[in-house]
Every structure is written in C-alpha cells, then in structure tokens.
C-alpha cells in the first residue's frame, strides 16, 4: 500500500511539494545534486478532522533551545494527544533581528538548533510515538544575506533596480522573492524536496502563503504527485 504524505498549508489550503529542478546558472549554495529517501515515510496519516497539532518554538520550548531539547520532551507532547508537531523554521537564518523567518540558507539546519542528523533523529523519535513532523516553510522572502542574493533577478525590485522588502509590510529584515523567475521557483521546490527526502519530514506549514502566487503552489503539487510512494 502506498504511503499517503500530506503537506498542510495552515488556514489557506492543503498542498504537497516535491520537485527536481534544472540547476543551470543557479547561484551557489549548499544544495546536493541528488536526494535519497532517509527513513521510511509514514503510512498511517490521520484524517484532517482527526489532527491535533502542536506548534513548537525551538528557542523557547526547552532550556537548550534546540532540537535535542525538544526531543527530550516528546513524551510530554504525546501525552497531550498530539499527532502532528509543527516546528517553527529550522533553516539557517540571518538578518539584523535574528528572526527564524529570515532564512539565509534553505538547505541547512541553523547551528543554533543542531544538525541534519539531529533533525533526522528528532523526526524518527516523533514517528515512533505516532506523531508526524511538519516544518515551517518561508517561501515568500529571505534574509538579505541569503545565498540567492548572488542573482538579483531572483528578487522583486523597484523601478531603480533595488531589491525591496515585501510590499505592504514592515518586514524590512527580509527581501521579497520574485516568483516570475522560473529558476528561483524551481529551486524553492527543490529545497522543499530536500527536507522531505533527506530528513523524512512529513510536510510543511507555509508562512505568508497568500503572498505567493497560486500558480506556484499548483505547479508544486503536480510535481509532488509524480514522486513514487508519496501522494
């Protein structure tokens, strides 16, 4: 029986994201050339009406402020009847206010929280307690020191060619991404594929989803459905 992997977009709609992209002329970052499934995808996914979700702020949830600290309290979370853990952003972050929503590298665990191995172990331990793990995903914008800044065309610009923060917001610590740039959109989906395969994450809660074009989400869903053993 094929596994059902669902990716939840909180308060907007449910989406699924997996895609392998063309990397020609892309800015340099920590991306690998090929991904392999780590661990075993969860087969028994609860129905939407059965979900009991718990959001975890890694910095605040444990004294260590990291993945290991949260892992040590998984039994406490499970006792609440939780069957899905939503981790606030775990990717490397930057910017002047150290916000976890200012991503500087989509392919790296922030050193403050641990390593890829720590994340893999955390997810495996959650799965052993019948809890899924979804990652907060920040698709709309990045930190100003993100690796993608090597190509300014990946970002929204004003009439003078200056990269800008998201329009209509006071989020000046982040730069708005340009979803008209196909290379950027492809790389974004590729990064989401990385965590699903290399860490066995169960999905994503997508931040500021309504700022991102629906066409991007639709293309991402279609890409996911082509991946074997995940639907």
Can you say where each PLM-predicted feature lies in the sequence?
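Bacterial N-terminal signal peptides that target proteins for export
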Residues: 1-9
């Amino acid at each position: 029986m094929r596994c059902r992997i669902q990716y939840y977009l909180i308060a907007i709609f449910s989406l699924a994201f997996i895609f392998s992209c063309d990397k020609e002329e892309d800015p340099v970052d920590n991306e690998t050339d090929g991904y392999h499934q780590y661990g075993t995808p969860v087969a028994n996914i609860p129905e939407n009406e059965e979900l009991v979700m718990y959001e975890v702020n890694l910095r605040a949830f444990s004294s260590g402020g990291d993945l290991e600290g949260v892992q040590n309290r998984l039994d406490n979370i499970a006792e609440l009847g939780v069957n899905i853990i939503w981790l606030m952003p775990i990717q490397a972050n930057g910017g002047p206010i150290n916000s976890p929503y200012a991503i500087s590298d989509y392919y790296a665990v922030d050193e403050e929280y641990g390593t890829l191995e720590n994340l893999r172990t955390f997810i495996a331990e959650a799965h052993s307690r019948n809890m899924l793990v979804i990652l907060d995903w920040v698709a709309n914008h990045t930190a100003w020191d993100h690796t993608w800044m090597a190509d300014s065309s990946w970002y929204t610009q004003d009439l003078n060619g200056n990269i800008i923060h998201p329009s209509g917001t006071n989020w000046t610590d982040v730069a708005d991404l340009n979803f008209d740039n196909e290379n950027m959109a492809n790389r974004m989906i590729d990064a989401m594929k990385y965590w699903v395969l290399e860490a066995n994450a169960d999905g994503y809660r997508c931040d500021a989803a309504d700022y991102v074009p629906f066409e991007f989400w639709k293309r991402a869903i279609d890409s996911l459905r082509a991946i074997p053993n995940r639907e």
